[in-house]
Amino acid sequence: MIKPSLIELERISDKYDIVPVCKEIFSDIRTPINVLRALKHISSTTYLLESAETNEKWGRYSFLGFNPSLEIFCKNHQMTIKGAMTSTFTTDNPTKEIRKILQQYKSPRFDFLPTFTGGLVGYFAYEYIRYSEPKLDFKDVEDISFNDVDLMLFDKVIAFDHYKKKIILIVNIKTNDLEKNYNKAIRELNELADLVAKGQQAPITEGKLLSEFKSEFTPEEYEDVVRKTQAYIKEGDIFQAVPSNRKQADFSGSLLNAYRVLRTTNPSPYMFYLSGKDIELTGASPETLVKLQNGLLETFPIAGTMPRGKNELEDKAFEDILIHDDKELAEHNMLVDLGRNDLGKISEFNSVKVTSFHKIERFSHVMHITSTVQGKIRPEFDALDAINAALPAGTLSGAPKIRAIEILHELEKSPRGIYGGAIGYLDFSGNMDVCIGIRMAVAKQGKVFVRSGGGVVKDSIPQNEYQETVNKAQSMIEAIKKA
């Protein structure tokens, strides 16, 4: 059955630029992974976005897409938009250019459709803040360079509804010639159904590590970075900062098998796999950067870390130590305040609230203290404003944020790129959900990169901070090795 009907869409078509048309099929013989393989057989540009609760219960939806109709990327103020034609130009405000594109795709929401029905999928790099804070002078000294923003526009979506055991196929159509476009959408939905049910699956190219992972900082060097950070804290420049350590190895093949391992060993609230012509990224992020659903903003600060115990008894003992650790609580509270401040920039007066505070969440190798901050977005702001307000997260930079970013840029050896940035989607209807780019790997030009960091405050012990970076990188590195 095709929904909505043409008659239903005709009633509302004058209010919108595009409308979604969908078809449901059974999902009993397909999985997100084998559908992804079918998509990879016909397109080098694909994505898979999934979610798992921390108790290992899978979220309701998995979203897949291929063959974007537009690609949007910007690096060092040089912006490119690739569609039927390609344009490249210089800009100081890529957000404005992205907004112009999204404004051409105003779409309604239907209760029977999933949370994402089409829009932009991709990432905003950590260094994207250079456009909202021009005084930050990021020099691009990295041997392999990542775009400041890289987004793909998908007007077709394949959504697995794991609760109803169905696949929802979605095609977005323009409203200017509705009946013609509706009939075309029916044909495209049937073609999508055939692709999902019978499409030839691309073989999974084995990912191969061709060298051991090498850290940018030795343990001693990283401990020195921690001490230098603490010197800035003692001078009163900052209260906290989050230095990081990049590991890299020579690599060939695909990260898809590593993603399959992550799905089993480290299910997390944000599971993602994205592939482009010259880049692949995958990860299992525990942390929302910012989420906007029907006017409600949310962010979920995570700060305060302990390793997982060997058994339930040790887990509970570690949890008790963590929740009573003054240093970890002070670090967490600072970042909750920073999250409130970020949302406060674009929220209605007195609407920002901490709705969950000091909750322990367990993941495969570590446990964290988590909180939830919510606010109601002001009508003059949108999803892109929310990303600009929150990026990069205080949990990946520090407090005060701008001074912490300046210090980290001085102390770290390479730009962060996607690490500490935002990964996810911006929906045609105005909603958005992006996670922080952590617990992830990026493969590009024969290298694979894994980066991790930890919050440093005045009482931090340098050796412990180095070990925290090891613990946080462990699940991703193990997934690559097992794949």
What would you call each of these model-derived segments?
Residues 1-483:
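Extended alpha-helical targeting/anchoring segments
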